[in-house]
Design a protein with these regions (language model features):
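Ligand-binding loop in jelly-roll beta-barrel domains
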Residues: 87-111
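Short, conserved beta-strand element in jelly-roll/cupin
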Residues: 51-66
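Short acidic-glycine-tyrosine-enriched beta hairpin
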Residues: 71-87
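Short, surface-exposed beta-strand-loop junctions and turns on beta-sheet-rich folds
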Residues: 56, 72-74, 100, 108
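A generic structural motif
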Residues: 67-69, 94
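Conserved short histidine dyad/triad with adjacent acidic residue
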Residues: 33-52, 87
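A short, N-terminal "cap"/entry segment at the start of jelly-roll beta-barrel domains
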Residues: 1-40
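Hydrophobic/aromatic beta-strand elements that line small-molecule binding cavities or substrate pockets
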Residues: 56, 80-81, 91
């Protein structure tokens, strides 16, 4: 089962990150699932592993290779690609070109919260 849902659009953007990974101003949405948010996330060239939240995102710019540990699937994503992540899954991101995406997600519950 592919987690790459399709390609929505292509866009030219003039934007540069200041840190290796970054998430900007989450906007929490009333009337939806508690804790649901929309924000922008990005990463510079490099590789890292992480645990996902329930999320759907659209790549705005850049290119990355994402390997999903649960399924063993590896996809290459770029501008306009729409991807679904499942809470608790682990994956490895290999950012090929600085990437930025807009995400609709439910943040994971922090222990002790």
């Amino acid at each position: 089962m592919s987690q790459l849902l399709g390609n929505a659009f292509s866009a030219e953007l003039d934007w540069k990150p200041k840190t290796s990974t970054f998430r900007t101003g989450a906007r929490y949405l009333d009337g939806l699932t508690a804790g649901t948010a929309v924000d922008v996330w990005g990463a510079e060239v490099g590789e890292y592993q992480g645990v996902t939240a329930d999320e759907i995102f659209v790549v705005l710019e850049g290119k990355a290779e994402v390997t999903f540990h649960r399924t063993g699937e590896t996809i290459v994503i770029g501008p306009g690609d729409v991807v679904r992540l499942f809470a608790g899954d682990t994956n490895t991101w290999r950012t090929i070109e600085t990437i930025r995406k807009v995400s609709f997600y439910v943040p994971p519950v922090q222990s002790g919260s």
